[in-house]
Swiss-Prot record:
It catalyses: beta-D-fructose 6-phosphate + UDP-alpha-D-glucose = sucrose 6(F)-phosphate + UDP + H(+). Homodimer or homotetramer. One of its GO terms (cellular component) is Golgi apparatus. Residues 113-141, 715-735 are annotated as: Disordered. The keyword Hydrolase does not apply. This is Probable sucrose-phosphate synthase 3. The modification Phosphoserine is found at S126, S130, S156. InterPro entries: Glyco_trans_1 (IPR001296), SPP-like_dom (IPR006380), SPS (IPR044161), SPS_C (IPR035659), SPS_pln (IPR012819), Sucrose_synth_GT-B1 (IPR000368). Plays a role in photosynthetic sucrose synthesis by catalyzing the rate-limiting step of sucrose biosynthesis from UDP-glucose and fructose- 6-phosphate. Involved in the regulation of carbon partitioning in the leaves of plants. May regulate the synthesis of sucrose and therefore play a major role as a limiting factor in the export of photoassimilates out of the leaf. Plays a role for sucrose availability that is essential for plant growth and fiber elongation. Activity is regulated by phosphorylation and moderated by concentration of metabolites and light. Residues 113-122 have a biased composition (Basic and acidic residues). Belongs to the glycosyltransferase 1 family.
């Protein structure tokens, strides 16, 4: 039946139309059927079948299908076609109803899970309240509020950002990864990734840079060195502002707004956002390098020698939110999130259509990876910025990590200073996007407002035509009568933009067709066949509908336009007394509605999403149901025919448009982020001291080779002793420095007496600081009991160390680190039994990244990094977490099923492996415990933010702070000691603990030793395989070895990876 596949798509369209117009009939099938079309007296089997199975179907479309079915002379073949069509309708309907049932079950289960999570959280929170405080429970705190009361409450405790903030000199980081991002001649609409978000982030960066108190704004995006796109997207830096754009007091050598393009993924290819996911960590490492360099530069310019850290890191969309969360954790600075378009909302819409299974949707849109990135972003974000209230209630409300009611409870407790037991919810703030009005030419509201239009179409006799924009001519050439009011729609040819419904509404309303023209600006195209299937389908349907309704001369659909033409297009529609329409099925905000209002165009817009808030502010048009063709046509007809209403809407739009200006947006934005809990790296090193240390240890490095080769040369010409010892000469400055390196001075300042540990660490830290490369051993070899497998692990560690030191070039300034889920005591016992000195390693990352130690203390003791605990402490609530995990793990089994009361516990706390930032448990029955993704979901529903993982061959479960991990610990070393992640070599097996995937991606070099790890914990990671969306299948940064590879082969793979670039 391959030749009849068109029927499936056509019948799906019929089933989805849900139009009204068929009168219900109760006729029953007869033995003899007359198939002729007549006056309605004969039985119509097609009509009967569709009416019985799918109610409310328009028979006009069905009749056209019927004509194709009966288009044959052979009655037997005709009957077979009829029977086949009927069976297809039946099958599609059953499938649709099955999907609807599954959808309702899924929604019901999620509702129950959310209610259970909220109930558990409020029970735990109420335990420490007094009787008087218990009245402030969930039901009493959550009361409906009027918009005015809500605004007063939200802003009452906030200090409004004003011009007296100039002394702040902030550094703000924005991230928008996908699409084609540049400051001028933006290619909006060139593909589905280059839309309104690109314009928004560029204009936001410019507007923020002009605000008092903001010194520099960096907008991070992807660098693309491909012949498929313009060369400008390969430029690493693009300046968005000039000195004239910024406040005079804020200008400086590095001030202003910039686009910073970071290479990640294949540099010679332009990739859609769905393909970028495996390379997100590469971006994080590249962006981190830029931020560290810039913080140092800004520190020299405006920070009095101290680093100037980003005030906030603001991610836009899921991919940038994921990146911003990791950067926020690495730098310990606040994160802000704007979703723009949300994955759960998109998934719900696609499932309701019933045309794709969940697996097909995920394959096309990578929707599971996107949703998990959005959940992680919610975990890490201090503030979530939305365009509308509807986005908070109906879209973010779908996520595990945000509960409106629980958020209000936690906020009320925090306001009273009551313990929240480690539970957190991000704050939501509605801040409508701004608009740049500098290019808007407001026309006088006079009858002569169409003078330019009159000159274009002929002008007055004897007068010379005025110069008019080229795009006007491009649009006007389509029209038979260009004097009619113009209905303007401007969007990508995306199915969700609902352009075809608009065209049907226009085509089927004769009064509207006679009174107005329709202009469709649907991006840019050269050949429809070269577009994506979705865009091509919309454009093809548009052309067919124009032909169907014979709209030639009434509809314009130009192929090309520039971004600079858009204001002229708005002005053309306004000069014809036209209307702007946005009929999208759901519109997250609707920036084009604001642009149209600024140019004096009334609007007709969808009632779903952001236009509701815009209409409430501007009062400049009408809202419609985007599924109702008749309502769309009536609203358009009302505005173009009633001139008084048209003028009223035009004036209202102009009067209220200031509410959406960029200065207003940025003022509210800065007010909101100023209320975030500011945090930054805890160490603040004196610049002069650092410089002196750098000079001192630079000399140390220059003399190290001489010392290592045991060339005992006397500095003053005397012959040294046989053991190479030298008596320092007080008159020789070189000897003085060397003496200080061997015997650190004992400082007696009172303020340093309580910092003996830090002083001891100071003598060792610079060794790590001066390393050029770091080899990190992160192999997870454990036996069935979770003990380290010495037979597999020890030879590999020894061979790696031997391979690095066998090459003179690599041996120079190379250090070693070990990264493991074992606690420090167990790790040191293992190394001792393997006869490997702890001093071989510059750092030890223990307990799944919750602790960092350095050798070098007195008597060979290991000393903890004094700043690391505070660095990873964000949103860590240990006691509340322990109680909740114990309940969940002993009441819920794998798959989310409830366990019987009285069943033996599945976990036992492992106090020996726990520390202040790691809760460890021993697993008694690994076949019954929840997977990581299920446990993380249940913890999020209860407001708990953390990083759970199974390790040591699934015999242990460890829970560490949200942004702590073995991979994040490497970034901490980069931030703390400026040892670039790109110069790290991470050695892993081909499987490991459930955080194994995080160790593979990034700009560090990964060496995967095949066959080294036979037992792992990956089976307990997630219910579906998403590895291809997290780890790149091919990468120049990944090399492979066999477990029995000789030392020379190991050396060769290190050399090969050292040459790798993105």
């Amino acid at each position: 039946m391959a030749g009849n596949e068109w029927i499936n798509g056509y019948l799906e369209a019929i089933l989805d139309s849900q139009a009204q117009g068929i009168e219900e009939t109760q006729q029953k099938p007869q033995a003899s059927v007359n198939l002729r079309e007549g006056d309605g007296q004969y039985f119509n089997p097609t009509k009967y079948f569709v009416e019985e199975v799918v109610t409310g179907v328009d028979e006009t479309d069905l009749h056209r299908t019927w004509l194709k079915v009966v288009a044959t002379r052979n009655s037997r073949e005709r009957n077979s076609r009829l029977e086949n069509m009927c069976w297809r309708i039946w099958h599609l309907t059953r499938k649709k109803k099955q999907l609807e049932w599954e959808d309702s079950q899924r929604i019901a289960n999620r509702r129950l899970e959310r209610e259970q999570g909220r109930r558990d959280a409020t029970e735990d929170l109420s335990e420490d309240l007094s009787e008087g405080e218990k009245g402030d429970g969930l039901g009493e705190i959550v009361q409906p509020e009027t918009p005015r009361r809500q605004l007063q409450r939200n802003l009452s405790n906030l200090e409004i950002w004003s011009d007296d903030k100039k002394e702040n000199r902030l550094y703000v980081v924005l991230i928008s990864l996908h699409g084609l991002v540049r400051g001028e001649n933006m290619e909006l609409g060139s593909d589905s990734d280059t839309g309104g978000q690109v314009k928004y982030v560029v204009e936001l960066a410019r507007a923020l840079a002009r605000m008092p108190g903001v010194y520099r704004v960096d907008l991070f995006t992807r660098q693309i060195c491909s012949s498929e796109v313009d060369w400008s997207y390969a430029e690493p830096t693009e300046m968005l502002t000039t000195a004239e754009d910024c406040d005079g007091d804020e200008t400086g050598e590095s001030s202003g707004a910039y686009i910073i393009r970071i290479p990640f993924g294949p540099r010679d290819k332009y990739l859609n956002k769905e393909i970028l996911w495996p390379f997100v960590q590469e971006f994080v490492d590249g962006a981190l390098a830029h931020i560290l360099n810039m913080s140092k530069v800004l520190g020299e310019q405006i920070g009095k020698g101290k680093p100037v850290w980003p005030y906030v890191i603001h991610g836009h969309y899921a991919d940038a939110g994921d990146s911003a969360a990791l950067l926020s954790g690495a730098l310990n600075v606040p994160m802000v999130l704007t979703g723009h378009s949300l994955g759960r909302n998109k998934l719900e819409q696609l499932l309701k259509q019933g045309r794709q299974s969940k697996e097909d949707i995920n394959s096309t849109y990578k929707i599971k990876r996107r949703i998990e990135a959005e959940e992680l972003s919610l975990d890490a974000a201090e503030l979530v910025i939305t365009s509308t209230r509807q986005e908070i209630d109906e879209q973010w409300g779908l996520y595990d990590g945000f509960d409106v009611k629980l958020e209000k409870v936690l906020r009320a407790r925090a306001r009273r200073g009551v313990n929240c037991h480690g539970r957190f919810m991000p704050r939501m703030a509605v801040i409508p996007p701004g608009m740049d009005f500098t290019n808007v030419e407001v026309q006088e509201d006079t009858p002569e407002g169409d003078g330019d239009l009159a000159s274009l179409v002929g002008g007055t006799e004897g007068s010379s035509p005025k110069a008019v924009p080229t795009i006007w001519s491009e649009v006007m050439r389509f029209f038979t009568n260009p004097h009619k009011p113009m209905i303007l729609a401007l969007s990508r040819p995306d199915p969700k933009k609902n352009i075809t419904t608009l065209l049907k509404a226009f085509g089927e309303c004769r009064p509207l067709r006679e009174l107005a023209n329709l202009t469709l600006i649907m991006g840019n195209r050269d050949d429809i066949d070269e577009l994506s299937s979705g865009n091509a389908s919309v454009l093809t349907t548009v052309l067919k509908l124009i032909d169907k309704y014979d709209l030639y001369g009434s509809v314009a659909y130009p192929k090309h336009h520039k971004q600079s033409d858009v204001p002229d297009i708005y002005r053309l529609a306004a000069n014809t007394k036209g209307v702007f329409i946005n009929p999208a099925l759901v519109e997250p905000f609707g920036l084009t509605l604001i642009e149209a209002a600024a140019h004096g165009l009334p609007m007709v817009a969808t009632k779903n999403g952001g236009p509701v808030d815009i209409h409430r502010a501007l009062h400049n048009g009408l809202l419609v149901d985007p599924h109702d063709q008749e309502a769309i046509a009536n609203a358009l007809l009302k505005l173009v025919s009633e001139k008084n209403l048209w003028h009223e809407c035009r004036i209202n739009g102009w009067k209220n448009i200031h509410l959406f200006s960029w200065p207003e947006h940025c003022r509210t934005y800065l007010t909101r982020i100023a209320a975030c809990r500011m945090r930054h790296p805890q160490w603040q090193t004196d610049a002069d001291e650092v410089a002196a240390q750098d000079d001192e240890f630079s000399l140390n490095d220059s003399l190290k080779d001489v010392q290592d080769m045991s060339l005992r040369l006397s500095m003053d010409g005397d012959k040294p002793s046989l053991n190479g010892s030298l008596e320092p000469n007080s008159a020789d400055p070189v000897k003085q420095i060397m003496s200080r390196m061997r015997t650190p001075e004992i400082k007696s300042k009172p303020e340093l007496q309580g910092k003996k540990q830090s002083d001891n660490l100071g003598s060792k830290y610079p060794v790590l600081r001066r390393r050029e490369r770091l080899v990190v051993l992160a192999v997870d070899c454990y036996d069935n009991e979770g003990a380290p497998d010495e037979k597999a692990m020890v030879p590999m560690i020894q061979n790696i160390i031997k391979a690095v030191r066998s090459d003179p070039q690599m041996a120079k300034n190379s250090g070693f680190a070990i990264s493991t889920s074992m606690p420090l005591d167990e790790l040191t016992r293992f190394l001792k039994s393997a006869k490997i000195q702890v001093s071989e390693f510059d750092t030890l990352i223990c307990s799944s990244g919750s602790e960092v130690y350095y050798p070098g203390g007195e008597e060979g003791k290991l000393l903890p990094d004094p700043d690391y605990s505070s660095h990873i402490d964000y949103r860590w609530g240990m006691e509340g977490l322990k109680n909740t995990v114990w309940k969940l793990m002993n009441t819920t089994a794998v798959g989310g099923e409830a366990r019987n009361k009285g069943s033996p516990s599945l976990i036992q706390e492992d106090q020996a492996s726990s520390n202040s930032h790691c809760v460890a448990y021993m697993i008694k029955d690994r076949s019954k415990v929840m997977r990581v993704d299920d446990l993380r979901q249940k913890l999020r529903l209860r407001g708990l933010r953390c990083h759970p993982m199974y390790c040591r061959n699934s015999t242990r479960m460890q829970i560490v702070p949200l942004l702590a991990s073995r991979s994040q610990a490497l970034r901490y070393l980069f931030v703390r000691w400026r040892l670039n992640v790109a110069n790290m070599y991470v050695v892993v097996g081909d499987r490991g603990d459930t955080d194994y995937e995080e160790l593979i991606s990034g700009t560090h070099k990964t060496v995967i030793v095949k066959g080294l790890v036979t037992l792992g914990s990956d089976a307990l990671l997630r219910s579906t395989d998403l590895r291809d969306d997290i780890v790149p299948s091919e990468s120049p940064f990944i090399g492979f070895l066999k477990v029995d590879s000789p030392v020379k082969e190991i050396t060769d793979i290190f050399k090969q990876l050292s040459k790798a670039t993105a």
